[in-house]
């Protein structure tokens, strides 16, 4: 990501960065409004996801995660910002007149050609089944169920690696470190998701984070005892427990939260780190 550092004496933007290489005007037929209700609340109005709320209004971009335009080459026309994800998206014009958005592969530029299908070249941005990919291929936007669309490795900078094939299954190493079995009939896109340096972006001020819909985070140790198990005490007091806990008293920092006896346990060869 080509970052531009603000040169201004104003404290709020002195260390802020912005990327000026992306287009931000989406196509009208590929967007639609989406009602964002709750802002972290459930149907009863109770907070179930903390630190969410506010934020700028967004239009949802329809992303083609299925890549079902078989054997029809497309050309990258624009690279655009998407407020609904940390990865960039690019507009593809296919040879039959179809126009779709896909996740921007790292290194792809305007004018590049991509294609999806079987027996297509192993090049950046092409989508093909795992059975046609050689071992060691880097990929993203991986399907778990054939025809359902990519569900794995879709965040900015995410990349998975094909490490083995046996029978009808392929073994993948995911960005989290998890080693998992996936059917070889599932589609995946070659390459890494773009916008790798998103974690190096400096917002510059608290208001910029509010625009993203992220509310302030308060430490439990500075709360009152009625609000958090870590709260209370005189002055700067410790948490008063052997181990840190969540606001509801459950163990924090290391406790496994995955549901036991899940149907996909047999497909996971090694848990994520």
UniProtKB/Swiss-Prot annotation:
The answer to whether the entry has keyword Chloroplast is: yes
Tell me the GO molecular function terms.
Answer: rRNA binding; structural constituent of ribosome; transferase activity
SMART domains documented for this protein = Ribosomal_L2, Ribosomal_L2_C
Please give the residue ranges the record annotates as the region Disordered. 1-27, 225-273
UniProt entry keywords in alphabetical sequence: Chloroplast, Plastid, Ribonucleoprotein, Ribosomal protein
Q: Sorted alphabetically, which InterPro entries does this protein's record hold?
A: NA-bd_OB-fold, Rib_uL2_dom2, Ribosomal_uL2, Ribosomal_uL2_bac/org-type, Ribosomal_uL2_C, Ribosomal_uL2_CS, Ribosomal_uL2_dom3, Ribosomal_uL2_RNA-bd_dom
* Any one of the GO BP annotations: mitochondrial translation
Q: Could you tell me where this protein is found in the cell?
A: Plastid, Chloroplast
Q: What is its main location?
A: plastid
What Gene3D superfamilies does this protein's entry cite?
A: 2.30.30.30, Nucleic acid-binding proteins, Ribosomal protein L2, domain 3
One GO cellular component this record assigns the protein to is: mitochondrial large ribosomal subunit
Instruction: Give a yes or no for keyword Magnesium in this entry.
Output: no
Similarity comment text for this entry: Belongs to the universal ribosomal protein uL2 family.
HAMAP family named in the record: Ribosomal_uL2_B (MF_01320_B)
Q: Tell me, how does this one assemble? A: Part of the 50S ribosomal subunit.
Mind telling me what this protein is named? Large ribosomal subunit protein uL2cz/uL2cy
Q: Which organism is it from?
A: Hordeum vulgare
By which gene is this protein encoded?
rpl2-A
């Amino acid at each position: 990501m080509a970052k531009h550092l603000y040169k201004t004496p104003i404290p709020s933007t002195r260390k802020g960065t912005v990327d000026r290489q992306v287009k931000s005007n989406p196509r009208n037929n590929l967007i639609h409004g989406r009602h964002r209700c709750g802002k972290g609340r459930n149907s009863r109005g109770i907070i179930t996801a903390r630190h969410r709320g506010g934020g700028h209004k967004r239009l949802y971009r329809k992303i083609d995660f299925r890549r079902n335009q078989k054997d029809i080459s497309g050309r990258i026309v624009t690279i655009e910002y998407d407020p609904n994800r940390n990865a960039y998206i690019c507009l593809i014009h296919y040879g039959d007149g179809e126009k779709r958005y896909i996740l921007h592969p790292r290194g792809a530029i305007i004018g590049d050609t991509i294609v999806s299908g079987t027996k297509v070249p192993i090049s950046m941005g092409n989508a093909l089944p795992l059975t046609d990919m050689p071992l060691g291929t880097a990929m993203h936007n991986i399907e778990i169920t054939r025809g359902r669309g990519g569900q794995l490795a879709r965040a900015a900078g995410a990349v998975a690696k094909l490490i083995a094939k046996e029978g009808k299954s392929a073994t993948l190493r995911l960005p989290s470190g998890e080693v998992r079995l996936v059917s070889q009939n599932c589609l995946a896109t070659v390459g890494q998701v773009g916008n790798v340096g998103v974690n190096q972006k400096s917002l510059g001020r608290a208001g910029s984070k509010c625009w993203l819909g992220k509310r302030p985070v308060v430490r439990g140790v500075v709360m009152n005892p009625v609000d958090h198990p870590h709260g209370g005490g005189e002055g700067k007091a410790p948490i008063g427990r052997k181990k840190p806990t969540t606001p509801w008293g459950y163990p924090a920092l290391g406790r496994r939260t995955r549901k036991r006896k899940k149907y996909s346990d047999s497909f996971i060869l090694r848990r994520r780190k």
